[in-house]
């Protein structure tokens, strides 16, 4: 075997695996952890070399070699690290197929956002924390809400964690607090005080247009149901035992129309005892219910709440109704009500129950929350009035 060293165009000795192409670019050949040959390239052999005019600047071949050797010694998959962020996110999603339709659509939205952003086509082993932060800033500049960006960041963090577990990369570039990069401009959850709740219902009861929604709003305030659970209620209610059985949601999609989903969380299936106020509201709703179209959705029919066409109401119907209700109320009253959504009634219910001293575990069950932290920290809002009342109670 010849001991003659191969040299480059500058008469420098080349190491094993190194070579120089006719166009002047350096090549390093190595074997990956799967026993397959791989190649890396650079216009520079060592860091002090200058990149030829018109060529993209990059680190030197020797620097790349050092990183590869370190990765191979540590068992890092140098090939896997070359997959793009889009490919990584797709791989992560492929490992969990049994998901709700809303989750699937959320995945599509994030994938589309990645495809339309420079980050999506980046090799995962080139993504640094500064790149992830710049991505968050770009998303904000494009008009994405803070909460949406935070949810997307959480998904990407999980994807990169999988890449770490697979020995494709060493660090997670999404391991940072979004609030350190962007201002959290998420609007606080709006709840109605008991006095506001009373004023709103009094207005609805007398109004020619909104009086027909009175009992539905009462039922929302008395049960704390998610609006999709509320829309899924049917006429098959256990009125004798005064129980609402919650085991599904009714939703509507522009692509497939009405469809049924299981409750949002594993704790979503529950039996809600009806208060006297809720019981009376349901009786009136059943009495005044119009004629329903013959419709079966996911095995369910005879939905309780119908629109003018006799079809089931969905979240969008109530969102529009509540917007109009608040707008009309505020038009004729100086003591304005805050802008709310149907979900605000759920916040209000949870807060009312917490302020009345309901056992946290019982409240968690009634709300169908996944964990107690959500019950206590996310929904239960204290007010100056409730704080004063609680202090007065403790002083007795």
Listing of model-derived features with the role each one plays in the protein:
Residues 255-260, 356, 377, 381-396:
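DNA/chromatin major-groove-contacting recognition/catalytic segments
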Residues 15, 146, 202-213, 272, ...:
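Short, basic (Lys/Arg/His-rich) helix/loop patches that form interaction surfaces
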Residues 38-40, 44, 49-50, 260-284, ...:
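C-terminal catalytic core of Y-nucleophile DNA break-rejoin enzymes
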Residues 52-57, 93-168, 186, 208-209, ...:
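N-terminal core-binding DNA-recognition domain of tyrosine site-specific recombinases/integrases
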Residues 236-244, 358-377:
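Short, polar N-cap/turn motifs at the start of nucleic acid-interacting alpha helices
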Residues 21-26, 32-133, 287-299:
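N-terminal DNA-binding module of tyrosine recombinases/phage integrases
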Residues 152, 165, 169-171, 175-227, ...:
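Basic, Lys/Arg- and aromatic-enriched nucleic-acid-binding interface segment
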Residues 232-290:
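Conserved tyrosine-mediated DNA breakage-rejoining catalytic core shared by Y-recombinases
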């Amino acid at each position: 075997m010849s001991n003659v060293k191969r040299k480059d165009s500058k008469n420098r000795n080349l190491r094993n695996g190194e070579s120089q192409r006719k166009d002047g670019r350096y090549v390093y050949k190595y074997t990956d952890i799967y026993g397959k040959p791989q190649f890396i390239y650079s216009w520079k052999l060592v860091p002090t070399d200058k990149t030829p005019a018109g060529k993209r600047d990059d680190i030197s071949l020797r620097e790349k070699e050092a990183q590869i050797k370190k990765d191979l010694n540590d068992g890092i998959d140098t090939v896997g690290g070359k997959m793009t962020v889009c490919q990584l996110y797709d791989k992560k999603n492929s490992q969990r197929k049994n998901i709700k339709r809303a989750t699937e659509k959320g995945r599509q939205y994030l994938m589309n956002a990645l495809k339309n952003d420079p980050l999506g086509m980046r090799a995962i082993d080139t993504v640094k924390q500064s790149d992830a932060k710049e991505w968050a800033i770009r998303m904000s500049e494009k008009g994405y809400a803070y909460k949406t960006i935070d949810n997307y960041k959480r998904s990407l963090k999980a994807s990169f964690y999988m890449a770490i577990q697979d020995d494709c990369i060493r660090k997670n570039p999404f391991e940072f607090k979004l609030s350190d990069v962007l201002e959290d401009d998420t609007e606080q959850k709006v709840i109605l005080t008991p006095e506001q709740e009373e004023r709103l219902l009094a207005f609805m009861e007398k109004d020619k247009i909104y009086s027909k929604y009175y009992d539905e709003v009462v039922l929302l305030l008395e049960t704390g149901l998610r609006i999709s659970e509320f829309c899924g209620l049917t006429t098959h209610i256990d009125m004798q035992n005064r129980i609402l059985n919650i085991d599904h949601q009714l939703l509507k999609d522009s692509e497939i129309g009405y469809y049924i989903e299981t409750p949002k969380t594993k704790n979503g299936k529950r039996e809600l005892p009806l208060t006297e106020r809720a019981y009376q509201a349901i009786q009136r709703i059943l009495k005044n219910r119009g004629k329903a179209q013959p419709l079966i959705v996911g095995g369910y029919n005879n939905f309780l709440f119908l629109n003018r066409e006799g079809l089931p109401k969905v979240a969008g119907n109530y969102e529009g109704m509540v917007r109009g209700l608040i707008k009309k109320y505020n038009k004729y009253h100086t003591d304005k009500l805050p802008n709310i959504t149907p979900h605000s009634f759920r916040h209000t219910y949870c807060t009312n129950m917490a302020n009345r001293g309901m056992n946290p575990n019982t409240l968690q069950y009634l709300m169908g929350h996944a964990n107690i932290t959500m019950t206590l920290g996310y929904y239960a809002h204290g007010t100056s009035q409730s704080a004063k009342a609680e202090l007065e109670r403790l002083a007795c």
